[in-house]
């Protein structure tokens, strides 16, 4: 949940959906 991306892809080790921290 720490890795953020504008593409809404799973980047962190937990597999949390990123895309909110742009």
UniProtKB/Swiss-Prot annotation:
Family per UniProt? Belongs to the natriuretic peptide family.
Q: Report the SS bond pairs.
A: 6-22
* Transmembrane regions listed in the UniProt entry: none
- What role is this protein assigned? Hormone which plays a role in endochondral ossification through regulation of cartilaginous growth plate chondrocytes proliferation and differentiation. May also be vasoactive and natriuretic. Specifically binds and stimulates the cGMP production of the NPR2 receptor. Binds the clearance receptor NPR3.
User: Could you identify this protein by its name?
Assistant: C-type natriuretic peptide
InterPro entries in the record, alphabetically? Natr_peptide, Natr_peptide_CS, Natriuretic_peptide_brain
**What SMART domains does this protein's entry cite?**
NAT_PEP
- Tell me where in or outside the cell this protein is found: Secreted
Gene Ontology MF annotations = hormone activity
Give Gene Ontology CC terms.
extracellular region
- What keywords does the record list, in alphabetical order? Disulfide bond, Hormone, Secreted, Vasoactive
Q: Give a single Pfam family match.
A: ANP
According to its UniProt record, where is this protein mainly located? Answer: secreted
Q: Which GO terms describe its biological process?
A: blood vessel diameter maintenance; cGMP biosynthetic process; growth plate cartilage chondrocyte differentiation; growth plate cartilage chondrocyte proliferation; receptor guanylyl cyclase signaling pathway
